[in-house]
């Protein structure tokens, strides 16, 4: 079972496609809950989360503190962190499930995963941003927060969760380390 945690800040429009991409996972019983960790938005972010059946947590605390609090409140053994506007490709939840099952078989495994950057499956016609993302991955530039993060809750807790301070999402990826981050076969893109 998986809990999705979505970081938001004035995200009423970008939250909708992110949530829509998670519906297949919820209907298949793989996604148990969605938590929206909001920075105190004054737009309709809370209403969008409510209509979608998400748990809404609002705090003006730094991003790392909000994400860590949301993770602590989950009931699932696996966490998936996404930014508002991050849209999983069809099959994304199934790819996440395969990774979770494989990792769970290796008891005590300390691995995490990110979704493939846009364009990684289509090397013949990538746009400039997709090409840059592919080069970054190929040259060891590592994962970026726009790719989401899939991690076992016990591993997340052992790492101390997201740190406080600037760029908490990138900091947790660095803390995990490139060698312990797998890239899923399914991708994620930022909705425009």
Q: Could you tell me what each predicted segment is?
A:
Residues 1-3, 33:
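Cell-envelope/extracellular polymer assembly enzymes that use nucleotide-activated donors
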Residues 111-123, 133-151, 157-158:
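A recurrent flexible, glycine/aromatic-enriched loop bordering the glycosyltransferase active site
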Residues 91-124:
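Conserved donor NDP-sugar-binding/catalytic core segment of glycosyltransferases
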Residues 10-26:
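Short, well-formed alpha-helical segments that are part of the catalytic scaffolds
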Residues 79:
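Short aromatic/hydrophobic "clamp" motif used to bind/position activated sugar donors
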Residues 38-46:
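A conserved acidic beta->alpha catalytic loop
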Residues 59-74:
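Glycine-rich, basic loop-to-helix element that forms the pyrophosphate-binding segment
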Residues 44, 64, 82-99:
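Acidic donor-binding/catalytic loop of UDP-sugar-dependent glycosyltransferases
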């Amino acid at each position: 079972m998986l809990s999705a945690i979505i970081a938001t800040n004035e995200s009423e429009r970008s939250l909708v496609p992110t949530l829509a991409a998670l519906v297949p996972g919820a209907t298949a019983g793989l996604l148990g809950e969605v938590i929206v960790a909001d920075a105190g938005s004054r737009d309709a972010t809370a209403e969008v989360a409510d209509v979608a059946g998400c748990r809404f947590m609002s705090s003006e605390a730094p991003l790392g503190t909000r994400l860590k609090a949301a993770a602590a409140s989950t009931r699932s053994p696996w966490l998936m962190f996404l930014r508002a506007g991050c849209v999983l490709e069809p099959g994304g939840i199934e790819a996440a499930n395969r990774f979770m099952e494989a990792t769970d078989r290796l008891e005590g495994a300390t691995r995490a995963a990110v979704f493939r950057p846009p364009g990684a499956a289509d090397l013949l016609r990538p746009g400039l941003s997709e090409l840059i993302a592919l080069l970054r991955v190929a040259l060891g530039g590592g994962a970026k927060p726009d790719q989401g993060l899939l991690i076992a809750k016990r591993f997340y807790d052992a790492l101390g969760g997201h740190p406080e301070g600037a760029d908490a999402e990138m900091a947790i990826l660095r803390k995990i380390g490139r060698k312990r981050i797998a890239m899923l076969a399914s991708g994620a893109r930022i909705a425009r």
